[in-house]
């Protein structure tokens, strides 16, 4: 028989803090109990459930507000990437999730790998791209990227400097 557990933390694919769940014995024995993410349900832990659910509701409201604020910030933000390309404008490598996270961090936007869909493996073409992000509490947002060749950026800077010299 699978044991009934009280989750102390949110666990992806299983439940939220304060939920009573049933999981496979190996998952319970090897992951949930040693990591402190759950306890075996008993009369004492069931009293703890109400307190955990109340805390979860407060945290959920704060997380949703933070996610909505982040989504509003992302609406007006475009992350610009310069990449090396060959003579046929094929990129060397790709713009990875880690690259996106670091550039967003430089712009003051905090993202994590959890925000990106699992299927997203990186941007491998030049141009404008939109990536759907999954934020906390079911809030979604679009992240706008512009991937340009490094020689295009150098040409734009030259044109700007020439225009400034003419003025």
Swiss-Prot record:
Chain segments annotated as coiled-coil in the UniProt record: none
TM segment ranges: none
A GO term from the CC aspect: ribonucleoprotein complex
Classification via SUPFAM superfamilies: L9 N-domain-like, Ribosomal protein L9 C-domain
InterPro entries, A to Z: Ribosomal_bL9 (IPR000244), Ribosomal_bL9/RNase_H1_N (IPR009027), Ribosomal_bL9_bac/chp (IPR020594), Ribosomal_bL9_C (IPR020069), Ribosomal_bL9_C_sf (IPR036791), Ribosomal_bL9_N (IPR020070), Ribosomal_bL9_N_sf (IPR036935)
GO MF annotations in UniProt: rRNA binding; structural constituent of ribosome
Keyword terms of this UniProt record: Ribonucleoprotein, Ribosomal protein, RNA-binding, rRNA-binding
GO BP term, example: translation
Function: Binds to the 23S rRNA.
Protein family per UniProt: Belongs to the bacterial ribosomal protein bL9 family.
Protein known as: Large ribosomal subunit protein bL9
């Amino acid at each position: 028989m699978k044991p009934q557990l009280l989750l102390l933390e949110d666990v992806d694919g299983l439940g939220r803090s304060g939920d009573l769940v049933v999981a496979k014995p190996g998952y319970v024995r090897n992951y949930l109990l040693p990591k402190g993410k759950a306890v075996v349900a008993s009369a004492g832990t069931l009293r703890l459930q109400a307190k955990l659910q109340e805390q979860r509701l407060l945290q959920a409201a704060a997380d949703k507000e933070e996610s909505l604020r982040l989504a509003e910030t992302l609406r007006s933000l475009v992350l610009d990437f310069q990449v090396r390309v060959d003579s046929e404008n094929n990129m060397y490598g790709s713009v990875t999730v880690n690259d996106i996270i670091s550039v967003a961090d430089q712009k003051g936007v905090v993202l994590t790998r959890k925000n990106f869909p699992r299927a997203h493996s990186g941007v491998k073409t030049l141009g404008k791209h939109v990536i759907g992000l999954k934020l906390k509490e079911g809030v979604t947002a679009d992240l706008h990227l512009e991937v340009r060749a490094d020689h295009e950026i150098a040409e734009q800077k030259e044109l700007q400097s020439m225009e400034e010299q003419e003025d």
